[in-house]
Amino acid sequence: MADLRDEKGNPIHLTDTQGNPIVDLTDEHGNPMYLTGVVSSTPQHKESTTSDIAEHPTSTVGETHPAAAPAGAGAATAATATGVSAGTGATTTGQQHHGSLEEHLRRSGSSSSSSSEDDGQGGRRKKSIKEKIKEKFGSGKHKDEQTPATATTTGPATTDQPHEKKGILEKIKDKLPGHHNHNHP
């Protein structure tokens, strides 16, 4: 088998997940596969260690092609073998990459707990811890939007004192088990 080297000149060993050498490189249907654009048998040193994706946002990382080589080219063509990925941790099986990098990095808008929110200008801004706590315990309302809580009591009449709003720390302490704050005047 030819000596394979990465872009920094380090040897690349073609092995399976158990460390056994790969003799014949095939896809899931048994067809021989070859990988182009990622591995070469001669070391190529670049000025930059960044990938070509930054320079060409719509370029493909590597393309795989089913075998079209003559039958005796087994060991020689293993130098461009599938199973060696371009740093993504995945192997390809005859599919070409179509579309830009942004399409693959797009995320869904639904999230159960978000640490950022819309800034109103098409971007995102990071929530503060105070905002997260208010959202969790204070139902996420602003101070001017909160409705005062009314308590109905049955039993002996109490003195009519104006009800003070609980601070955020008191609300948190009330939610914690065993830390109920009963120091109300």
Curated annotation (Swiss-Prot):
Transmembrane segments: none annotated. Residues 67-94, 147-159 have a biased composition (Low complexity). Residues 1-185 are annotated as: Disordered. GO terms for cellular component: cytosol. GO terms for biological process: response to abscisic acid; response to cold; response to water deprivation. Pfam families: Dehydrin. Residues 1-10, 44-55, 130-146, 161-177 have a biased composition (Basic and acidic residues). GO terms for molecular function: metal ion binding. It comes from the Eukaryota. Belongs to the plant dehydrin family. This is Probable dehydrin LEA. It comes from Arabidopsis thaliana (Mouse-ear cress).
